[in-house]
Amino acid sequence: SLVLHQDADPRTGGVAVCGFTTAGMVGVIATSHIIKMLALRQLGTVMHKDFPAVALIHDEVPKHPVRVYQGDGIGVFTSEIQFGNETDIPFATTVLEWFTKGGFDRLIIIDGITRPEKELTSGDLYGVGSISAARERLKRLDIEPIQQGVVSGITGFLLSEGDRLGIDITALLSEASPMYPDARAAALAVEAVSDLTGMEIPLTELLENARSIEDSVRDIIENASQMLPAPEPENTTDIDPSFG
């Protein structure tokens, strides 16, 4: 459940962005960069009885692994630990709770995808919109839509709920390496967030320090994952080979 800091006001408004620890760690790298570049303040954490007792240390400060941040017209939900897929629906429900309490207009999900049959080179970015307005935005930015396919995990559930409830949700799916953190794929998604929101989010630091960022994220995930059961293989967001 969402636990806010004392005296925190969850009403942020504007755009909500969320990212999770999935393929290529794209979501968590992208959201961490957005938080840093926009100097967002932490609003609270997400707690669950099955979460490990662990603190992730950032610049000497201990943090819970699942956190929410807010700034002027933007909120960010980020998870730095990969959980088993049995937590996908509770996680997604918590995201929707945060979205509602924050009074946001729309939600952007940043996620990584893999296509095992394709050799990854430059990488591609795909988009899915839950309502027609979201799909029109993607079209205006020439972000390739997924015509047919399957999006699994938290992202897939949120998109389906967006369609069911009429919530404006956009998923930015950046093709990433299935083997290691992919900061370059994250940069592609962050650039799209800038375009979708009109917010200036500098990319120079992310691109110039891609290797060190990837190494740092890998260390955090590996250390934290030792405290969790191994995730199910299907927890990675995949796309059905029929899409394109």
Question: Which residues does each PLM region occupy?
Answer:
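N-terminal short beta-loop-beta anion/metal-coordinating cradle
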Residues: 1-81
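Short beta-strand segments
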Residues: 18-19, 77-78, 109-111, 173-175
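Gly/Ser/Thr-rich loops at beta-strand to alpha-helix junctions
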Residues: 20-26, 83-85, 112-116, 152, ...
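Conserved active-site and cofactor/substrate-binding residues in soluble primary-metabolism enzymes
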Residues: 25-29, 86-90, 94, 149, ...
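Secondary-structure boundary elements
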Residues: 41, 90, 96-107, 164-168, ...
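Internal, conserved structured core segments that host functional sites
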Residues: 85-135
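Catalytic cores of processing enzymes, dominated by hydrolases/peptidases
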Residues: 116-196
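Extended, histidine- and acidic-residue-enriched regions that form the cofactor-binding/catalytic faces
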Residues: 168-244
